[in-house]
Design a protein with these regions (language model features):
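Acidic, serine/proline-rich low-complexity intrinsically disordered regions
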Residues: 10-16, 20-278
Length: 278
């Protein structure tokens, strides 16, 4: 047994976990996130999946769940959730992850989203679709990541999403930003798109993510490729160090998107004894 190799791998994973824990803490604190960022990793090889299972660091759904429901364990409860595709209940997610082909039943269920069967079929068949179906998907709080996730999902408000996407555009060089939203596939389809194209994505809640995914506060979904996360966070950290705050809308402000007009003469804060004009 290569004990040296195992030790090197352990040290690397330990370092990676520390790095992601730091990024997690920074994002939660500076962006004022309510939901934990979720690292998404797809397992395609049975050997790799069984090796992970054998470590016993995860939980699994007792009953079949939608992708959005399974993610709640990571996003709201801070748990490491392994979702086997055999327990993936949502037909839309099963299609975009390449587990099932588009069926007549799927089209019929979505007729309300179009003007007729032909149009809805075209809509469904044009959704992002992974060519190779994963065996399982791991959903973890970013702080618990061991190595780079495939995609990182943020459930956030308008201005938090604005900062994430703006900083992603800056580090990727992509502009304008063109998100991809598919009918009834906000989180699953949005994640598949980000994975397939190595591109950030932003989606509104669909019926499934709004109800099953508990997004009743009007949250917005942002997906960032795992390979781009470190550069994006580094840019944010540099801005905080240089200006004193993460805000892009009001430079130097600690709140992302402070709702105060720049020239407002009313909302001004000074130390006691300082004159307002100074």
């Amino acid at each position: 047994m290569d004990k040296g190799g195992a030790r090197r791998r352990f040290v690397r994973e330990e370092r990676d976990m520390a790095d992601y824990a730091d990024m997690h803490a920074f994002l939660m604190r500076e962006l004022r996130l309510m939901h934990e960022p979720v690292g998404i990793r797809f397992f395609f090889e049975a050997e790799e999946l069984e090796e992970f299972r054998g470590r016993g660091v995860h939980v699994e759904p007792v009953r079949p769940l939608t992708f959005c429901q399974a993610e709640l364990g990571a996003r709201m409860e801070g748990r490491v959730v392994l979702l086997d595709m055999k327990k993936l209940w949502c037909t839309d997610a099963r299609c975009v992850f390449g587990v099932d082909a588009v069926s007549e039943g799927v089209v019929r269920d979505l007729l309300r989203f179009g003007t007729g069967e032909a149009q809805v079929r075209r809509f469904v068949e044009s959704k992002p679709c992974m060519e190779r179906a994963p065996l399982a998907v791991l959903l973890s709080p970013l702080r618990a990541q061991e190595g780079m996730p495939d995609v990182v999902h943020f459930c956030c408000d308008n201005m938090q999403a604005y900062h994430l996407v703006d900083d992603w555009m800056a580090v990727s060089g992509v502009h304008p930003f063109r998100p991809s939203l598919s009918i009834n596939s906000a989180v699953c389809g949005g994640t598949a798109f980000s994975y397939l194209h190595t591109q950030a994505n932003m989606t509104l809640a669909c019926a499934g993510s709004y109800n099953s995914g508990k997004m009743e506060r009007g949250e917005i979904n942002v997906m960032i490729p795992g390979a781009h996360l470190e550069g994006m966070v580094s840019r944010m950290k540099e801005r905080v160090e240089k200006t004193g705050g993460i805000s892009l809308t009001r430079q130097g402000q600690p709140f992302p998107g402070a709702d105060i007009c720049q020239n407002c003469p009313v909302i001004v804060f000074k130390k006691p004894g300082e004159r307002a004009g100074r």
